[in-house]
């Protein structure tokens, strides 16, 4: 029996579609993962963004990330279904190793969101140190 591993699937769905069609494409991917024996741990829908370059003559994409656990044999079956879905512009499935998870924890620990109270405190501290140095 294969052991389940943690994966992340990043999707770019055609941003020109109606919200119902985007929801249907997301539901399709999630359904395929669960039907093939995987279990979804988190879904992060980022929303519509401008792409860096045209993909299939589209410049707006709907970005989403799905974290799931599945056996390695499931990935090929999921990719087979995703590959032929016309509404999906791009997809990438990666195996989340312990090194990647550790790096993600460090980034979350030390990152500061611009405009947050922590960011304001850092900016004030930097300004105070600049005036003291002069």
Swiss-Prot record:
HAMAP family hit by this protein: Ribosomal_bS6
GO MF annotation list: small ribosomal subunit rRNA binding; structural constituent of ribosome
Keywords carried by this UniProt record: Ribonucleoprotein, Ribosomal protein, RNA-binding, rRNA-binding
Domain of life of the source: Bacteria
Lineage: Bacteria, Pseudomonadati, Chlorobiota, Chlorobiia, Chlorobiales
Pfam assignment, any one: Ribosomal_S6
BP GO terms, sorted: translation
Protein name: Small ribosomal subunit protein bS6
Organism for this UniProt entry: Pelodictyon phaeoclathratiforme (strain DSM 5477 / BU-1)
Role played: Binds together with bS18 to 16S ribosomal RNA.
CC terms in the record's Gene Ontology section: cytoplasm; ribonucleoprotein complex; ribosome
Entry similarity comment: Belongs to the bacterial ribosomal protein bS6 family.
């Amino acid at each position: 029996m294969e052991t389940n591993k943690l994966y992340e699937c990043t999707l770019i769905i055609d941003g020109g579609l109606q919200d119902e069609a985007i929801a249907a494409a997301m539901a399709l991917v999630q359904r395929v993962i669960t039907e093939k024996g995987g279990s979804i741990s988190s879904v992060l829908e980022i929303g519509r963004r401008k792409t860096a370059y045209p993909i299939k003559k589209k410049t707006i994409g709907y970005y989403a990330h799905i974290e799931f656990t599945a056996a390695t044999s499931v990935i090929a079956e999921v990719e087979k279904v995703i590959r032929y879905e016309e509404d999906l512009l791009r997809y990438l499935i990666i195996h989340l190793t312990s090194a990647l998870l550790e790096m993600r924890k460090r980034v979350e620990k030390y990152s500061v969101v611009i405009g947050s109270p922590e960011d304001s405190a850092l900016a004030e501290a930097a300004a105070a140190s600049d005036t003291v140095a002069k």
